[in-house]
């Protein structure tokens, strides 16, 4: 553990719609801390509603950082997020205050506590080669190439995961080593594992499913259609992460009059529930036993479970 890792941080993980943001605000008020986005989709601009970013009222209640600061035309990696967090934690005006990391991206939490893998530089020539092939041949074809050249990492990737497939091929060609080998070489952690309060929300599945349905209906009523219309006006590459946000494809189909309002909402709700299930499974299998599990944010404050790190 790095000596300059931040001590007494609060980490709040959990599936989408589980109440993480409300809990983070309550903790920020209790500690005088500040909230740091730990969700890979909430970094992108334009999609305030569809990515469930904090509302204006939320922002007025506590300081929030790293939300909506990336244009949807960009690709934002775990490494870039790590760099942004490192810079944020070094700001003088935030020294001595409790950082509260909240979100649903497990790899971000892993990087915070365990350090980031030291990734090699890839030449522009190699990068252009593989990205050109991806555009020409598609993810499935390049996944087949990866199966032959690096079967171990190919087995860990979905055949549709174009971004990670290209990255694995780039690294293999540039270094002669599998991306899996590079991922074993860790840098310094940003947060001290021992002193951090680590919380994971695991609400009742039926309750979460209903909450997801209500929330998406509210998103639709509050302007999700306008968000997607604004995103489509940018004429972005469909392969960009922001274009893959849940709800974008469904609302786009509604705008193109190829899907009814009811079907667009229903499909978005189903996709969100499936995503929440994948998140819950990841947190259950990947987080250590020192993460405390709660059914709700309210439960965290009951019975003296929460301790003010100040």
Swiss-Prot record:
SUPFAM superfamilies: P-loop containing nucleoside triphosphate hydrolases. One of its GO terms (molecular function) is ATP binding. One of its GO terms (biological process) is tRNA modification. Coiled coil: none annotated. ATP binds at residues 14-21. Its EC number is 2.5.1.75. Its cofactor is Mg(2+). Keywords: ATP-binding, Magnesium, Nucleotide-binding, Transferase, tRNA processing. The record marks 105, 127 as: Interaction with substrate tRNA. It catalyses: adenosine(37) in tRNA + dimethylallyl diphosphate = N(6)-dimethylallyladenosine(37) in tRNA + diphosphate. Pfam families: IPPT. Residues 39-42, 163-167 are annotated as: Interaction with substrate tRNA. Substrate binds at residues 16-21. InterPro entries: Dimethylallyltransferase, IPT, P-loop_NTPase. PANTHER family: TRNA DIMETHYLALLYLTRANSFERASE (PTHR11088:SF60). Belongs to the IPP transferase family. Monomer. Catalyzes the transfer of a dimethylallyl group onto the adenine at position 37 in tRNAs that read codons beginning with uridine, leading to the formation of N6-(dimethylallyl)adenosine (i(6)A). This is tRNA dimethylallyltransferase. It comes from Brucella canis (strain ATCC 23365 / NCTC 10854 / RM-666). The gene is miaA.
